[in-house]
């Protein structure tokens, strides 16, 4: 049976400042930690990315032509405050006013994120969100943006608090490149959630007319053997690290006893302690019912089995299937069942996981209000032929996930929109330029845009709301 989506459903495309804009040192933009980190550790940089800084009118015209009526954009903090605080960079402010005006001209609603992995270098080198001063700087930055950009109707505080902590302190593929420090992971998550809560409370106290929420990456975690209590426990602990800790902070305003028991177990095995203060929980409690929406970024699920041994994580950054490894001492090991397909980067393709995660939020956090799927898509080594890409695999991937959303809505979940990652091809943090996600192919040499087969398909779905 052909499935449909509601008439008011947003069919969006997602971007991020550092992955799309280029112009990393242009017009007074301050440095971010990624600038030097990429030069020192990778075979690519964020120049020119998709040159969105100059070519956003082209991308927004394409969005309008192809039925994309929402766009995720992030503001580069260091374009507004080059050192994270203090002096405002007027040219950066002007750029975003112009960008948002173009969005509205093209009838593409901007959903604007304040922080998408790109803390200014001056703050990052001073501990990033492990340093509590950063909470104050972030709230000041948020306050400035809320006041300066009244044309923005949808605000997101952070993109993917979970993967930031994981990337910086667990996997070690984000600057500062620290591995296996679970205490820093949880402390980073916590301090960023406090920052989120304080920004949300400020937004509501000021009476701004728009909406505000947060974007969490929520990869669903399953036990490899549902009958094995040790595997079930491994999945529960892995879920606490990546999902439950931050969801509790968002919607409970505290960490449940079950969550803290898991956190304490993980830290007892791996070392370290947390600094959780009374005023933190006052802030979390004050914001827990103020989130207008939850953004869910969903790409994959994981299966966990019990594991006794040392932590080892190997990141597959070059698309060599089967080269990744993930096992955490005292938690478990990721082992995918043979029947589940995966990408060349070992990302597990499992649309049912999205349904299960949405229903988990609905059940466990009934004060969630509404959900947008703020990222979902397929990274591919696209073959560019005949000025296009015949990306049937991407179409199939997106189709399956949209059908899941139709099911979730039918079963009572309030899902209001979907943003494909990504609108056009962008640079990928730890994979460079080979891993493409866009509806529009970008020739990174010429910066020309070419609609892929998926763009034509997405346009039809957006126009008809029929998933075909």
Swiss-Prot record:
UniProt keyword list: Glycosidase, Hydrolase
Per UniProt, the enzyme's principal EC class comes to hydrolase
Q: Which Pfam families does the record cross-reference, listed alphabetically?
A: Glyco_hydro_1
Task: Kindly indicate whether the keyword Hydrolase belongs to this entry.
Answer: yes
Q: What is its EC number?
A: 3.2.1.85
GO CC term (a single one): cytosol
The active site is formed by 160 (proton donor), 375 (nucleophile)
Q: Which GO terms describe its molecular function?
A: 6-phospho-beta-galactosidase activity; beta-glucosidase activity
> Reaction catalysed?
a 6-phospho-beta-D-galactoside + H2O = D-galactose 6-phosphate + an alcohol
Alphabetized Gene3D superfamilies for the sequence:
Glycosidases
UniProt cross-references to InterPro entries, sorted A to Z: 6P-beta-galactosidase, Glyco_hydro_1, Glyco_hydro_1_AS, Glyco_hydro_1_N_CS, Glycoside_hydrolase_SF
- Provide the residue positions that the database annotates as binding D-galactose 6-phosphate: 19, 116, 159-160, 297, 428-429, 435, 437
Q: In which pathway does it act?
A: Carbohydrate metabolism; lactose degradation; D-galactose 6-phosphate and beta-D-glucose from lactose 6-phosphate: step 1/1
GO biological process, alphabetically ordered: carbohydrate catabolic process; lactose catabolic process via tagatose-6-phosphate
Give the family per the record.
Belongs to the glycosyl hydrolase 1 family.
Record's protein name: 6-phospho-beta-galactosidase 2
Encoding gene per record: lacG2
């Amino acid at each position: 049976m052909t499935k449909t989506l509601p008439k008011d459903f947003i069919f969006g495309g997602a971007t991020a400042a550092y992955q799309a804009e280029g112009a990393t040192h242009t017009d007074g933009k301050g440095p971010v930690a990624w600038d030097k980190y990429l030069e020192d550790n990778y075979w690519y940089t964020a120049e020119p990315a998709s040159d969105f800084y100059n070519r956003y009118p082209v991308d927004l015209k394409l969005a309008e032509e192809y039925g994309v009526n929402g766009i995720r954009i992030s503001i580069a903090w260091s374009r507004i405050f080059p050192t994270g605080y203090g002096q405002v960079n007027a040219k950066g402010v002007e750029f975003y006013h112009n960008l948002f005006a173009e969005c509205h001209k093209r009838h593409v609603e901007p959903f604007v994120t304040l922080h998408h992995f790109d803390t200014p270098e001056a703050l990052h080198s001073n501990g990033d969100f492990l340093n509590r001063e950063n909470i104050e700087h972030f709230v000041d930055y948020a306050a400035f943006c809320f006041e300066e950009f009244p044309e923005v109707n949808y605000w997101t505080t952070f993109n993917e608090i979970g993967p930031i902590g994981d990337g910086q302190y667990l996997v070690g593929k984000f600057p500062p490149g620290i591995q296996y420090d679970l205490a820093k992971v949880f402390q980073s998550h916590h301090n960023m959630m406090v920052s989120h809560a304080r920004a949300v409370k400020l937004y509501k106290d000021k009476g701004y007319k728009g909406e505000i929420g947060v974007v969490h990456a929520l990869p669903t975690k399953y036990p490899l053997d549902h009958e094995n209590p040790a595997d079930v426990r491994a999945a529960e602990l892995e879920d606490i690290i990546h999902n439950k800790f931050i969801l509790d902070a968002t919607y409970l305003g505290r960490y449940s006893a079950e969550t803290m028991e898991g956190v304490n177990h993980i830290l007892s095995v791996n070392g370290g302690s947390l600094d959780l203060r009374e005023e933190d929980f006052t802030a979390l409690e004050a914001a827990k019912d103020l989130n207008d929406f939850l953004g869910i970024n969903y790409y994959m699920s994981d299966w966990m089995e019990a594991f006794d041994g040392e932590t080892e994580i190997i990141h597959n950054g070059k698309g060599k299937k089967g080269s990744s490894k993930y096992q955490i001492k005292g938690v478990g090991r990721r082992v995918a069942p043979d029947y589940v397909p995966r990408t060349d980067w070992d990302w597990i393709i499992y649309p049912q996981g999205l349904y299960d995660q949405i229903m988990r939020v609905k059940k466990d956090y009934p004060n969630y209000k509404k959900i947008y799927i703020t990222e979902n898509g397929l990274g591919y080594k696209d073959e560019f032929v005949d000025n296009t890409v015949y990306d049937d695999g991407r179409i199939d991937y997106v189709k399956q996930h949209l059908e899941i959303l139709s099911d979730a809505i039918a079963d009572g979940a309030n899902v209001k929109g979907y943003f494909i990652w990504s609108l056009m091809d962008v640079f990928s943090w730890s994979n460079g330029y080979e891993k493409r996600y866009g509806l529009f192919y970008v020739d990174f040499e010429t910066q020309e845009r070419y609609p892929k087969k998926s763009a034509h398909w997405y346009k039809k779905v957006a126009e008809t709301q029929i998933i075909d």
